[in-house]
Curated annotation (Swiss-Prot):
Top-rank lineage group of the source organism: Eukaryota
Any one of the GO CC terms: endoplasmic reticulum membrane
Transmembrane segments: 750-770, 774-794
An example Gene Ontology biological process: endoplasmic reticulum membrane fusion
Domain annotation GB1/RHD3-type G: ranges: 49-307
Full protein name: Protein SEY1
MF terms (GO), sorted A to Z: GTP binding; GTPase activity
Protein family per UniProt: Belongs to the TRAFAC class dynamin-like GTPase superfamily. GB1/RHD3 GTPase family. RHD3 subfamily.
Location within or outside the cell: Endoplasmic reticulum membrane
Binding site residues for GTP: 59-66
Matches recorded under InterPro entries: G_GB1_RHD3_dom, P-loop_NTPase, RHD3/Sey1, Sey1/RHD3-like_3HB
Topology class, membrane: Multi-pass membrane protein
Major location (coarse): endoplasmic reticulum
Length: 873
């Protein structure tokens, strides 16, 4: 029979199905299984943190330990065959509790603790190991270092025996307990020894069996060699005990299962009854058997590593020293009195602490009403109750414990006090900010100017008065922490910072409004300048007011408009900022940002005008105005005798000069870029990174940009200039060709002798028309119609309409003829004969070889290529 063969052993593979029933932690050769962490992950225990419990079971071999665990926790540990007596469990095995929910018809409220892990330890006193007790001692030490509860499985008839009742095993447990936990005397982690008495008949009361076992345990404890200072310690200082009896599984199966069901209800979280606590802090356990003091405080995700390290030290016979903390027994009474004094204190203060914690967790600190009187009364009563009970003890211990009690109380009260001031601080700052914003909005709605600085001063005074009133009401007399001057100073500084932030926000909004105004003004002004650039007419074609401005000074005019607009904006900004109580540094930063932002607005507008489509349109308009209109702004009507080439050349060359002019932002007066770097100025020393993060880098101004002022003022690159020149010339050539055609279009090349011949041969017809009033009137009407058609330039549309009508008439005639032939017998016969001839010709053509066809195809393609070349030409 394979021991626990359906579990994941240390040599098993990585298949998750092998973890379904558990895992072997340590095999019979004392090797630790590295797959324990995978099993915990498989059972979803790893993310549980401290929310898990570990139980180990001890007992003699073949006493039904695995059977007990399987029935109690729904596990699947292998059990011994009823037909033979031999070792079943080898090493240490681990499985998670599978019985999560109790039967709700028994106890609807009962529920076992989450993530209960059960370790089945190899039985003792087995013939397989014989006299070798090394593994027995090592497994006991391992279980005690990791487990909260140690279940001792014994039979009723073994009670009172030494070996049969596992007293040798328990002595080992006590010895390793001293070895494990007494090296660090700061604390004493407790463990629970849970005796499960099997085959319990009830003849001997369970209480009597319990007394017998406790007497044996105390006798074993007394026989142990204890460290110095702990000679008088008792077993109850380190262990709690619990007892349960189970009927015979085979003779009373139903009753056995009922008692197992009842027993399972005890495996949940419990607590000690406060009324039964003794001087050592122990007492009866209520609820479940899992107490916080039993837990080893090892997170679930690190348990496998922790257990492996513990076993490595144990198996290599190294000293196992676990960090613990313990209070001295001499201080228990004072600690008990202190706890009793804190009970009433907790009742008064805990509600305020809970409310404050909930408010902090929700992110909305709340000023608690009535906190000051409650703190003063609770502190006074707690100290008085402690003095009454503890003043009879040793003065030094009494004073030390009183100081500790006061420190505990003051620590909690100080936390409440600081939390109250923090809530008053945060709510006060928030109310201050909201009040200032509301007052500013009210002033804006009225449409009148408001004094921002006066609003801030008034609201700041009200906020400080409210904070001081709340702080005074929370003070506790005689408390060393009862001083709020530091918090008041921090509050005032925070109000000052908030005031500065509100002022900066208001100045940002002011700057945004001014920037919008600058954008609107610059947009209109620059549009007018570039629109004037598109008109090359003079005389009556000049602007409505004044003469047409010179094209060469366009950048001078744009720069002047820009500087004047920004100066006006700076004046508006400075006047409005004076009411904000802003310092000179803040105003300087605002003006500096305004100049940079304004340049960005101008540059964006210029880039928009310099877009290829817009620029080509303006160049064409400029050229056409110079070519189609004379100096007086009168449209030109071209005649064959006009010098079109000269006018074209002058207009084209004049327009071409605009491309290099517009390529760079350069003043005509100085023949250099405008002094942008001097105009913007250096970065103010008070400017913060937040003031610069939304600014666009400017070449020649920002050293980090890597661009010079010349590059910043370059609007069109060389490649784009050449492309614009070529495209403009093509456009101008088209206008020139159109003008040339219009000039020569009216010339008729008719020989003079044709008119004499026409007059001689048509004399009779002329006389007939002149003598006949009808013909004469018809001729007169036709002449009038032809003249009107010519003046309205309708000859072209009339000719096109005539051609379209004639084409439609031909198509309609073909359709009618086809319908006639299809309707008559003669026509159908003729169409059939024509179809037969076509089929014969197609059959004969299909018999031709591919080579002539290919030659013909190449010839046809060559002909098509020639036709295409002719069309292109």
């Amino acid at each position: 029979m394979v021991a626990n063969g359906h579990f994941a052993g240390s040599a098993d593979g990585q298949d998750s199905s092998s973890y379904e029933h558990g895992v072997q932690v340590i095999d019979e050769d004392k090797e630790f299984n590295p797959n324990v962490s995978k099993y915990l992950t498989y059972e979803n225990v790893t993310p549980a943190g401290f929310n898990y419990h570990l139980i180990s079971v001890f007992g003699s071999q073949s006493t039904g330990k695995s059977t007990l665990l399987n029935n109690l926790f729904g596990t699947h540990f292998s059990v011994m065959s009823e037909t033979e007596r031999r070792q079943t469990t080898k090493g240490i095995w681990l499985s998670k509790n599978k019985r999560l929910e109790l039967r709700k018809d028994r106890d609807p409220q009962a529920k076992m603790a989450d993530n209960i892990l059960v370790m089945d330890v190899e039985g003792t006193d087995g013939r397989e190991r014989g006299e070798d007790q090394d593994f027995e001692r090592k497994s006991a030490l391992f279980a005690l270092a990791t487990s909260e509860v140690l279940i001792v499985n014994i039979w009723e008839h073994q009670v009172g025996l030494y070996q049969g009742a596992n007293m040798g095993l328990l002595k080992t447990v006590f010895e390793v307990n001293l070895e494990l936990f007494l090296k660090d005397n700061k604390s004493t982690p407790r463990s629970l020894l849970f005796f499960v008495i099997r085959d319990f008949l009830g003849t001997t009361p369970l209480q009597n069996l319990q007394n017998t076992l406790l007497q044996d345990l105390n006798r074993i404890w007394s026989s142990l060699s204890k460290p110095a200072g702990l000679e008088n310690s008792t077993i109850n200082d380190y262990f709690d005990f619990a007892f349960a009896g189970l009927p015979h599984k085979n003779f009373q199966p139903d009753k056995f299962m009922d008692e197992v069901q009842k027993l399972s209800t005890r495996f949940c979280e419990g607590h000690r009854d406060p009324s039964s606590l003794d001087r050592k802090g122990t007492g009866s356990i209520e609820g479940g058997i899992f107490l916080p003091e039993y837990h080893r405080r090892i997170p679930a995700d690190g348990f496998a590593v922790y257990a492996e390290g513990v076993w490595d030290q144990i198996v290599n016979n190294k000293d196992l020293d676990l960090p613990t903390q313990q209070e001295l027994l001499a201080q228990f009474r004072c600690d008990e009195i202190s706890r009793e004094a804190l009970v009433a204190f907790d009742e008064a203060i805990s509600p305020f602490e809970s409310k404050q914690a909930e408010a902090v967790q929700a992110g909305t600190p709340e000023v608690l009403g009535g906190l000051g009187p409650a703190m003063r009364n609770a502190r006074m009563k707690a100290v008085k109750n402690f003095d009454t009970e503890a003043c009879r003890y040793h003065k030094r211990v009494y004073q030390m414990k009183k100081t500790e009690l006061q420190d505990k109380i003051d620590t909690r009260l100080k936390a409440l006090f600081l939390g109250q001031l923090n809530a008053a601080h945060r709510s006060g700052v928030q109310e201050f900010s909201e009040s200032v914003s509301a007052a500013v909005k009210a002033g804006q709605k009225k449409g009148a100017s408001y004094d921002f600085a006066e609003i801030v001063r008034r609201q700041r005074k009200l906020a400080i008065e409210k904070f001081e009133k709340e702080a005074r009401s929370t003070l506790v007399e005689d408390a060393p922490w009862s001083n709020y001057q530091q918090e008041l100073s921090l509050y005032q500084k925070d109000l000052e910072r908030t005031s500065g932030q509100l002022r900066r926000d208001e100045m940002r909004r002011l700057a945004t409004r001014v920037e919008r105004w600058v954008r609107s003004r610059l947009g209109e002004s620059v549009d007018l300048e570039f629109n004037a650039l598109g008109s090359g007419r003079g005389g009556s074609g000049a602007p409505e007011f004044g003469d047409k401005p010179s094209e060469k000074t366009i950048w001078d005019r744009v720069w002047t408009l820009f500087v004047d607009t920004v100066l006006d904006a700076e004046r508006r900004f400075t006047e409005r900022a004076s009411s904000f109580d802003a310092g000179l540094d803040e105003v300087d930063v605002g003006l500096w940002r305004l100049r940079r932002k304004s340049w960005g607005v101008l540059r964006a507008k210029i880039d928009e005008e310099m877009m290829e489509g817009n620029l080509l349109l303006k160049l064409r308009e400029n050229f056409e105005d110079k070519f189609r209109y004379d100096d007086a702004g009168v449209p030109r009507i071209w005649r064959p005798t006009d010098d079109i080439e000269s006018v074209y050349s002058q207009a084209r060359e004049s327009t071409l000069t605009l491309i290099p002019l517009l390529a760079r932002f350069k003043l005509a007066e100085t023949n250099a870029p405008p002094p942008l770097d001097k105009w913007i100025g250096h970065t103010p020393s008070s400017a913060t990174p937040a003031d610069e993060e939304d600014l666009t880098p400017i070449g020649g101004v920002d050293d980090d940009e890597g661009k010079s002022l010349e590059e910043e003022m370059t609007l069109i690159g060389e490649a784009k200039k050449q492309d614009l020149t070529v495209r403009f010339k093509k456009t101008a050539d088209g206008v020139y060709v159109e003008a040339k055609r219009s000039a020569i279009g009216g010339i008729t090349q008719v020989p003079l002798y044709f008119y004499g011949l026409l007059f001689a041969l048509g004399w009779n017809e002329i006389l007939a028309v002149l003598r006949n009033p009808v013909y004469f009137l018809l001729l007169f009407v036709c002449a009038i119609g032809a003249y009107i058609t010519y003046q309205l330039n309708l000859w072209g549309p009339i000719i096109k309409m005539t051609e379209a009508a004639s084409h439609q008439a031909v198509e309609e005639g073909k359709r009618r003829l086809r319908e006639f032939l299809e309707a008559s017998d003669t026509g159908r016969q003729a169409m059939a004969m024509s179809g037969a001839r076509n089929a014969t010709e197609e059959h004969e053509m299909s018999r031709l070889s591919r080579k002539p066809a290919e030659r013909g195809g190449r010839k046809n393609r060559a002909d098509e290529d020639v036709d295409d070349d002719d069309d292109d030409f």
